[in-house]
Amino acid sequence: MIDLLWISSDGHPQLFYQFINIPFAFLFHCLSSQGHLSIINRYVYLAMGGFMLAIATMGPYSSLLFLSAIKLLLLIHYIHPMHLHRWILGLQMCWQTCWHLYVQYQIYWLQEAPDSRLLLAISALMLMTQRISSLSLDFQEGTISNQSILIPFLTYSLYFPALLGGPLCSFNAFVQSVERQHTSMTSYLGNLTSKISQVIVLVWIKQLFSELLKSATFNIDSVCLDVLWIWIFSLTLRLNYYAHWKMSECVNNAAGLGVYFHKHSGQTSWDELSDGSVLVTEASSRPSVFARKWNQTTVDWLRKIVFNRTSRSPLFMTFGFSALWHGLHPGQILGFLIWAVTVQADYKLHRFSHPKLNSLWRKRLYVCVNWAFTQLTVACVVVCVELQSLASVKLLWSSCIAVFPLLSALILIIL
């Protein structure tokens, strides 16, 4: 299993590192639930775990995270809560963008491959930006009252289960999970087994698709096969994300995070920290629905940070900020522009066509056609965003699949 996870990482070792984190998260939960760790020691355990994980996986580049954590504590101590969010988000995005631009300088100007440890550190820095900007907004909204003890804030910025993979957890939910730590061991172990099994299945399916892409099936020059190849390639990239998100969810659950107790039914839910279901997301029959389901905690963060706080063109401002957060590579800029246009066109098309769907067969036909359109458009977005460089743009526009983003733009203009 470990070999399978390592092979499937394909230069993105977060999946493997997150798997290695599970025993340490399990130990934390066992010690906490049995009363061997005080609340302060729980925070220390999680923070020290993040500190050591960063050094072990990122080497000297772990300082990117440590400097951000120190800056967070200084700002919390010296800045009034009402002004904290503006300072934290502004400084953190400047710090993160500088490193993104440095990577682009290495790739496009020096023609050098960046250090993999630097790329991992920047990825972790992006996740830290989510956490500390969410924290600062909570301060501004008055949902956090006690800021005299700084250890919970330091731990929240660096705790090891979410350091390399999320999902985003609000500060108040994080504190409640750390301080509670009482769950049924049967439910706990059953949940971990189930989610690890899901990761294995996702990795296995991804490997099958990877082998299919290398097969002789696609050596024939055909428009349909060309479009099919790009769609399968995009699906393979998405499966990598789904496996990584599920593994990160599993690590958080192993540490006792993301659990919710239903008082009325007496049952325990382990899905409070989740970036969504692969089946629900891939079954989305509208681009706008897919956009809301994809990487759900990040979508909620973008809605909270940008969409709900912007009066002019909130949709395009949100996708623009997402491109900035991801690194502003040429492919990413094009990919998020395509996605924004497609989602806006979907809203217009739905308002136009919905009154005309007055029979069952029309509704089913509309759903089927729109699902295929969603899949092919998302394929264009994912290829651009993931390949990042101008090569992704060339790959996209040399294929007939480029018709679908253009069709979205046409719908947006006409309707």
Curated annotation (Swiss-Prot):
Location in or out of the cell: Endoplasmic reticulum membrane
Reaction catalysis annotation: octanoyl-CoA + L-seryl-[protein] = O-octanoyl-L-seryl-[protein] + CoA; decanoyl-CoA + L-seryl-[protein] = O-decanoyl-L-seryl-[protein] + CoA; L-seryl-[protein] + acetyl-CoA = O-acetyl-L-seryl-[protein] + CoA; L-seryl-[protein] + butanoyl-CoA = O-butanoyl-L-seryl-[protein] + CoA
Annotated Pfam families: MBOAT
Keyword Phosphoprotein in annotation: no
Ranges per topology, Cytoplasmic: 29-42, 79-84, 139-193, 248-312, 346-364
Similarity-based family: Belongs to the membrane-bound acyltransferase family.
Subunit description: Monomer.
PANTHER family per UniProt: GHRELIN O-ACYLTRANSFERASE, PORCUPINE
Keywords: Acyltransferase, Endoplasmic reticulum, Membrane, Transferase, Transmembrane, Transmembrane helix
Signal peptide positions on this chain: none
Function: Catalyzes ghrelin acylation at 'Ser-3' using preferentially octanoyl-CoA, hexanoyl-CoA and decanoyl-CoA as acyl-CoA donors leading to ghrelin activity. In vitro uses also acyl-CoA donors of different lengths from short-chain (C2) to long-chain fatty acids (C16) knowing that acyl-CoA donors from butanoyl-CoA (C4) to dodecanoyl-CoA (C12) are more efficient compared to longer acyl-CoA donors, such as myristoyl-CoA (C14) and palmitoyl-CoA (C16) that are not efficient.
Membrane spanning stretches: 7-28, 43-58, 62-78, 85-103, 123-138, 194-214, 228-247, 313-326, 329-345, 365-385, 395-415
Active site: N295, H326
GO CC, one annotated term: endoplasmic reticulum
Posttranslational modification: Not glycosylated.
Enzyme Commission identifier(s): 2.3.1.-
Any single GO BP term: peptidyl-serine octanoylation
Identification of the protein by name: Membrane-bound ghrelin O-acyltransferase mboat4
Taxonomic classification: Eukaryota, Metazoa, Chordata, Craniata, Vertebrata
Organism per entry: Danio rerio
One term of GO molecular function: serine O-acyltransferase activity
Membrane topology: Multi-pass membrane protein
Side Lumenal, residues: 1-6, 59-61, 104-122, 215-227, 327-328, 386-394
